Amino acid sequence: MQFFPEYNIFLKIGGLQIHMYAVCIIIGAFIAYMLGQYNFKKLGYSSEILSDYFFGVLMTGIIGARIWYVIFMWKELYMSHPEEIIAIWHGGLAIQGGIIAALIYSYYFFKKKDIPFFVAGDAIMPGVLIAQACGRWGNFFNHEAFGSAVSLNFLKLLHLPQFIINNMYIEGAYHHPTFLYESVGNLIVFLVIILVVKKKAQCTGEQFFSYFIGYGIVRFFVEGLRTDSLMLGPIRMAQLTSIVFIIAGVAGIYCLRNHQKRKS
């Protein structure tokens, strides 16, 4: 048994390897689960509900993220190497595809449990930002999802730990640590939601929709720095999806408040 036999492998037992990519996803998912449990208990729901929900939504999200990635990388990679489709330990999870798949699963799950969708969304979505922030570190260990080339002096100006600077030296050049930009951005959005939006929200569902606004803004700007964007013709797919998320979030809050005014 070896811990960290390579920088991107957490544990090796014989032929079994546990990659840091998986560890980061598991840590993020666990934190999101615990935050969700805390919020559900405050709302008076049984902890068993989220336990039943968690595994299903996690698997659905991972499958959706993989399918999204494979679709847009089909010609470049998977058409000629179909055996790589299941090799998620090599990276290649497009989080926006996972979000969409998880939303569909969540809608039907909570409908079956007779729990209002926006109530569940407010309880769960802030924690998703923590999961995403942790998951981005998996990209760091996999040397993927990095940005365009920059100078060493630029990275030093950011006052980054040396191990991050060292691992941003990829393919003969230093690169923007876009994984870190998005990770920090997601944490900031999380804090804004729980410290500001939660206190000032006029309607149930505003935290849910604020997630899409905040995450959409962060991802749109970070994506502009990346070199590995999934493309739809000349358009960066993640930026297009981010715009859709932002519009949906703003429209959702507007509709909720408008509906509230009509009721009162």
Where do the PLM segments sit?
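Hydrophobic, membrane-interfacing alpha helices
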Residues: 1-264
